[in-house]
């Protein structure tokens, strides 16, 4: 059986739908997580109680199969267990244990010119384009989703016994068909036990990573009260595995709580919304697409959102929002740097939540203070090679908050990622070149300081930083010697 599965996965880009309709039903609820007794949808589940955040406890139940080894006595994190379960099922090697140790070289504390990527850290998605990606919060587990609705898991630090250089490489672990339409975002819960996806089928799904089964759906196609267009983004609350927020092309933002009662139709479980904000970014009486809705770190009640019509960012506080006519707690003023409005493609925050970064269609990244949104932006990041030409271009902040990465880099006929140093007063930047041949769209950072990027050429690339001059040595070689390598340059 392991040989058959291994053969199936050896076909590059080949996917197999392992989530049949029968397996997508909601599993029995564990005794430690009973359903809420009240059928009313209340907002206090999102709020902070007495200034102290109480993280709900959740018992992770893993699928038991005869092929699995008996559990070890050392307690491991959910993501590590999930990865090992998947590799054991596929007959993979466990010669190098997965480590959660933080890299010594993280983010912008290194010179921006030290990033590089080897050929073994590039994977190709054949016959389908990667649309989004996301790293797990505690491990080197990378999820990549495509235009066909496929979801694939990669290990960005896989060690091979036969590799004489003993260098980690990127390896495909597992994959399944998550949606029958394009997937626009993917996000891990804080403990990495759950995975949420948003799709063009007007719904989002939440998967149990240990079984790869869909445990609930956020939305119902064609039903009032839910999203009526493509769901552009879905995100878990950092301090609660039950609370999520999603935004859609229809201009609405919906808050979800998986502890509330849902409905089951034909064996499929659908969650009911807790709060829906219609026309969240209404512009001149017309609806506009909500491009991003992100929780502020260390908060269970505040969400920052952006739209496609203008550069305005809005802060929503669930402690003060009203269901009849919701009003934002704060809004950024109109930009005066250009003669016309430019939409925002994506928003991210610094790890401490003090800074907010917005990637604008005018190819400028704006930095705001989360405490003073009404005062406008406090800093801009510019680079002549940065061209944010579509709403698929995303940005991400490193785990230490010192480096900002954004897709859309173009130099001559080469595409790449543009990185900025956020610790300096002046804008210091570099471009990661040589890794992709077509437009680079989404990027994300791992907890260990690795950077992943995807491109319209179908490639998934992992970047590392080094103090040993790896990138500098590559820049000194000719093109034939660095074919399929990527490196950073000023």
Curated annotation (Swiss-Prot):
Pathway: Protein modification; protein ubiquitination
SUPFAM superfamilies for the chain: WD40 repeat-like
DNA damage keyword on record: no
Start and end residues of each stretch annotated as Disordered: 18-40
Matches recorded under Pfam families: WD40
Subcellular location: Nucleus
Single GO BP term: cell division
GO cellular component entries: Cul4-RING E3 ubiquitin ligase complex; nucleus
Main location: nucleus
Entry GO MF terms: protein-containing complex binding; protein-macromolecule adaptor activity
WD repeats: 178-208, 226-257, 285-317, 339-369, 387-419, 435-464
Gene3D superfamilies according to UniProt: YVTN repeat-like/Quinoprotein amine dehydrogenase (2.130.10.10)
Keywords of the record: Cell cycle, Cell division, Meiosis, Mitosis, Nucleus, Repeat, Ubl conjugation pathway, WD repeat
Subunit (UniProt): Component of the DCX(DTL) E3 ubiquitin ligase complex, at least composed of cul4, ddb1, cdt2 and pip1.
Protein family (similarity comment): Belongs to the WD repeat cdt2 family.
PANTHER family documented for this protein: DENTICLELESS PROTEIN HOMOLOG (PTHR22852:SF0), LETHAL 2 DENTICLELESS PROTEIN RETINOIC ACID-REGULATED NUCLEAR MATRIX-ASSOCIATED PROTEIN (PTHR22852)
Described function: Substrate-specific adapter of a DCX (DDB1-CUL4-X-box) E3 ubiquitin-protein ligase complex required for DNA replication during mitosis and meiosis. The DCX(DTL) complex, also named CRL4(CDT2) complex, mediates the polyubiquitination and subsequent degradation of cdt1 and spd1. Involved in the regulation of mitotic and pre-meiotic S-phase progression.
Protein's UniProt name: Cell division cycle protein cdt2
Organism listed in the record: Schizosaccharomyces pombe (strain 972 / ATCC 24843)
Gene: cdt2
């Amino acid at each position: 059986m392991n040989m058959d599965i291994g053969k199936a996965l050896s076909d590059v880009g080949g996917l197999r739908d392992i989530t049949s309709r029968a397996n997508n039903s909601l599993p029995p609820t564990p005794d430690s997580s009973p359903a809420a007794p009240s059928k009313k949808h209340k907002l206090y589940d999102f709020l902070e109680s007495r200034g102290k955040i109480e993280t709900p406890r959740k018992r992770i139940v893993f699928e038991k199969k005869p092929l699995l080894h008996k559990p070890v006595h050392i307690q491991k994190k959910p993501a590590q267990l999930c990865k090992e379960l998947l590799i054991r099922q596929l007959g993979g090697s466990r010669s190098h244990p997965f480590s959660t140790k933080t890299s010594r070289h993280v983010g912008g504390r290194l010179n921006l010119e030290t990033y590089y990527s080897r050929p073994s850290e590039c994977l190709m998605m054949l016959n389908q384009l990667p649309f989004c990606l996301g790293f797990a919060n505690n491990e080197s587990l990378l999820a990549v989703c495509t235009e066909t609705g496929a979801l694939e898991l990669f290990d960005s630090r896989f060690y091979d016994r036969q590799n004489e250089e003993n260098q980690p490489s990127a390896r495909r672990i597992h994959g399944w068909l998550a949606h029958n339409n394009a997937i626009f975002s993917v996000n891990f819960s804080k403990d990495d036990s759950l995975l949420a996806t948003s799709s063009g089928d007007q719904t989002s799904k939440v998967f149990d990573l240990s079984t790869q089964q869909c445990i609930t759906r956020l939305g119902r196609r064609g039903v009032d009260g839910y999203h009526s267009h493509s769901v552009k983004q879905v995100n878990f609350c950092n301090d609660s595995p039950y609370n999520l927020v999603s935004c859609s092309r229809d201009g609405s933002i919906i808050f979800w709580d998986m502890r509330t009662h849902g409905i089951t139709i034909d064996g499929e479980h659908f969650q009911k919304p807790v709060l829906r904000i219609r026309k969240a970014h209404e512009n001149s009486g017309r609806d506009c697409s909500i491009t991003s809705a992100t929780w502020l770190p260390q908060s269970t009640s505040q969400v920052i959102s952006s739209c496609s019509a203008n550069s305005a960012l809005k802060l929503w506080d669930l402690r003060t929002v009203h269901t009849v006519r919701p009003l934002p707690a704060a809004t950024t003023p109109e930009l005066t740097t250009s003669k016309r409005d430019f939409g925002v493609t994506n928003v991210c925050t610094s790890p401490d939540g003090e800074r907010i970064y917005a990637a604008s269609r005018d190819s400028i990244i704006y930095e705001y203070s989360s405490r003073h949104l009404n005062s406008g932006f406090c800093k801009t990041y510019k680079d002549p090679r940065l061209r944010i030409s579509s709403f698929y271009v995303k940005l991400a902040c490193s785990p230490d908050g010192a480096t900002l990465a954004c897709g859309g880099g173009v130099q001559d006929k080469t595409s790449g990622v543009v990185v900025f140093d956020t610790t300096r007063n002046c804008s210091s930047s570099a471009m990661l070149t040589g890794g992709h041949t077509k437009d680079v769209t989404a990027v994300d950072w791992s907890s260990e300081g690795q950077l992943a990027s995807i491109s319209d050429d179908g490639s998934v690339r992992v970047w590392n930083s080094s103090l040993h001059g790896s990138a500098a040595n590559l820049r000194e070689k000719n093109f034939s010697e660095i074919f399929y390598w990527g490196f950073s340059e000023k």
